[in-house]
């Protein structure tokens, strides 16, 4: 099909918005369909593309008006829309050169955020505080997030814990699920037979094997599970906790899931080892065996809803964790501790 403009003269002479028509051709036959009719049968993705096309025409029409114009883009790119994402980034880079355009870009897409951060403009991460005020924090994580975790700074313990799922993902893709190092890191993130006996040094040695020049000045003789829980306690008890810092959210998510699994294992009669989707399958067992009460069930379901996707280190999985408030995670951690 071809896209045409029904009111081309009016766009040029009267600055009207473009009215699109679609010409569908099948051999010698041609049928013209207007935008309103077409929207009745388009998918959401196709409607989005059509909407963007309409906006682009309107922006282009305003380029030469010599009037100051504020452009606000709100979640213009979907998480998995790689092809259009790069096109949108390049277009935004182009139009920002126009001195008449002032641009505000809002997004939940972490990968898109990092892509446009190279423009060098002001960057903010926004959260809502306890008084329900909207707070603009300094934009972080514009460079490689994983590289920042290699630093021996005040976040060293949180950085170390955050790197565990990242390296586990590397092993998952490069080796197999029977690999000893993969199994060790799995036991750091899920309650297995050996989880309570793992030392910090064991996990640290695996991280060093896959992260170049990684050093962490932490107590290697500590029990890893106690180390994770202790770090979660420090985060939960911090005054004026950083609401944006990803490490806080990832570490709390890991601690919450471990606490939940530890609790459920104490309640069920487990006949066979669970090899996949452990938290979910443990919850299913508690229901089958009628092992938990309604209050406990409510808390565990919140754990399943929040933490599952937050412990994978890639661009899209940042989106749910960025949207989850730190206060919500702290409360859930305290709830699961007291369950």
Predicted features by range, described:
Residues 1-42, 61-64:
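Extended helical coiled-coil dimerization/tether regions that scaffold
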Residues 44-71, 86-94:
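GG-anchored amphipathic helix commonly corresponding to the ABC/SMC/Rad50 NBD signature/C-loop
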Residues 77-78, 92-93, 97:
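Aromatic- and carboxylate-enriched substrate-binding clefts and catalytic-loop regions
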Residues 101-108:
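Structural recognition of the conserved hydrophobic beta-strand(s) that form the central parallel beta-sheet
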Residues 31-41, 58, 66-75, 155-162:
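Glycine- and acidic
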Residues 1, 127-339:
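Acidic, Mg2+-coordinating catalytic modules of nucleic-acid enzymes
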Residues 74-82:
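Walker B catalytic acidic pair
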Residues 112-123:
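Short regulatory helix/loop adjacent to the ATP-binding pocket of P-loop NTPases
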């Amino acid at each position: 099909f071809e896209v045409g403009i029904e009111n081309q003269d009016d766009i040029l002479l009267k600055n009207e918005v473009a009215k699109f028509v679609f010409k569908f051709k099948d051999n010698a036959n041609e049928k013209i369909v207007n935008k309103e009719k077409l929207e009745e049968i388009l998918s959401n993705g196709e409607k989005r593309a059509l909407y963007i096309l309409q906006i682009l025409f309107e922006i282009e029409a305003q380029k030469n008006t010599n009037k100051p114009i504020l452009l606000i883009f709100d979640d213009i790119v979907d998480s998995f829309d790689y092809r259009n994402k790069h096109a949108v980034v390049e277009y935004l880079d182009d139009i920002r050169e126009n001195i008449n355009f002032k641009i505000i870009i809002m997004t939940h897409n972490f990968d898109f955020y990092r892509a446009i951060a190279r423009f060098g403009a002001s960057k903010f991460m926004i959260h809502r505080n306890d008084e329900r005020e909207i707070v603009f924090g300094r934009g972080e994580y514009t460079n490689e997030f994983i590289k920042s975790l290699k630093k021996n700074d005040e976040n060293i313990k949180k950085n170390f814990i955050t790197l565990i799922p990242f390296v586990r993902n590397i092993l998952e893709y490069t080796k197999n699920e029977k690999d000893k190092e993969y199994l060790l890191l799995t036991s750091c993130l899920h309650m297995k037979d050996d989880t309570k006996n793992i030392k910090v040094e064991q996990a640290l040695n695996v991280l060093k094997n896959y992260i170049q020049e990684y050093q962490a000045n932490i107590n290697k003789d500590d029990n890893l599970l106690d180390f994770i829980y202790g770090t979660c306690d420090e985060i939960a008890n911090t005054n004026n906790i950083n609401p944006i810092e990803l490490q806080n959210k990832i570490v709390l998510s890991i601690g919450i899931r471990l606490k939940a699994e530890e609790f459920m294992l104490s309640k069920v009669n487990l006949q066979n080892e669970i090899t996949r989707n452990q938290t979910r399958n443990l919850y299913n067992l508690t229901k089958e065996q009628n092992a938990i009460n309604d209050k406990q069930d409510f808390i565990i379901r919140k754990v399943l809803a929040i933490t599952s996707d937050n412990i994978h280190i890639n661009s899209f999985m940042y989106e749910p964790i960025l949207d989850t408030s730190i206060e919500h995670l702290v409360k859930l951690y305290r709830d699961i501790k007291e369950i």
